[in-house]
Design a protein with these regions (language model features):
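Short, glycine-rich nucleotide/cofactor-binding loops
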Residues: 6-20, 47-53
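Histidine-anchored nucleotide/phosphate-binding helix
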Residues: 18-33
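Small/aliphatic-rich secondary-structure junction motif
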Residues: 30-50
Length: 119
């Protein structure tokens, strides 16, 4: 299958269900054999920090699975710093993306054939 998707997660702190669904959609696409990547940007960097640190939540296990599978492509370096989650993000070992003035590049993914989804 030639379809590829990149999900940019911008869900705010009070939109945990939206961020969790990004993980679920990524898992579904991956399990169906469709290439998928997750990029946490904007307020979504706080969601990533929460997935990593809230070990009692079901989303933590899904986060770990997506990380292990290499589905999580990265997190915005600028936003991680500005939103005060730079240290928790650094501890995840997930690449910090900074191609466009400290932010991840959506064009890079489009040029690689990915269809973007923004949540």
């Amino acid at each position: 299958m030639d379809k590829k998707f990149v999900i940019f997660v911008h869900a705010k702190e009070d939109e945990g269900a939206k961020a969790a669904h990004a993980l679920l959609y990524a898992q579904e696409l991956h399990d169906a054999g469709i290439e998928v990547k997750l990029v946490f940007d904007g307020a979504g960097v706080k969601s990533l920090a929460a997935f990593a640190s809230n070990t009692e939540r079901p989303t933590h296990q899904l986060y770990l699975k997506m990380k292990e599978l290499g589905v999580i492509a990265g997190v915005c370096e600028f936003c991680s710093t500005q939103m005060g989650v730079e240290e928790p993000i650094r501890l995840t070992g997930i690449p910090q993306l900074n191609e466009i003035n400290g932010h991840p590049s959506i064009a890079r993914y489009v040029l690689e054939g990915f269809t973007p989804i923004v949540m």
